[in-house]
Amino acid sequence: HHDIGKISNPSFFTENQLSEQNPHDNITSKESVEIIKQHVLDGVKLAKNAGVPERIIEFIKTHHGTNLIGYFYNKEAKLDPEIKKVDFRYDGPKPFSVEMALVMMCDSVEAATKSLDKPDNDKIDSFVETIIDKQVEDQQFENCELTFKNISIIKSVLKEKLKNIYHIRVSYSDGSN
């Protein structure tokens, strides 16, 4: 349910782009950010109209927290070093339960992993660590009861599941399978 708002502008989201054409190429980074942020508001509206329970709607609201929309921020920062990060952040709120934080981590890692070229054990391990560490550093989980032990376990599970998805097998030193 967390991404149902993408249905309002599907072609602006990578997972729905079936051709080489990217509509973001024809608009400014600031316009792109507004469209991307809008999927959260559209999702909330669609969910409310469909009678989705408020508890689920809270997950829609928090699944990006106040994360930086890094691709467009970095693109714009090259053109204008005076830009403000706040203009390139989701509006929040940040997750306020462990379950909401888990959805944020899973969504971020899953989406970003799709961009990996030839994923292998090391790339997946590094990617999961980097993405979740950025969220921790950015204080995305400050409103929920999430421990460092929880985060470590979540990272391990995500790494294992992603390796299963990409069918990455353990390499045996003696050459046997």
Annotated model-derived regions:
Residues 28, 106, 118-119, 123-177:
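Long, compositionally biased intrinsically disordered regions
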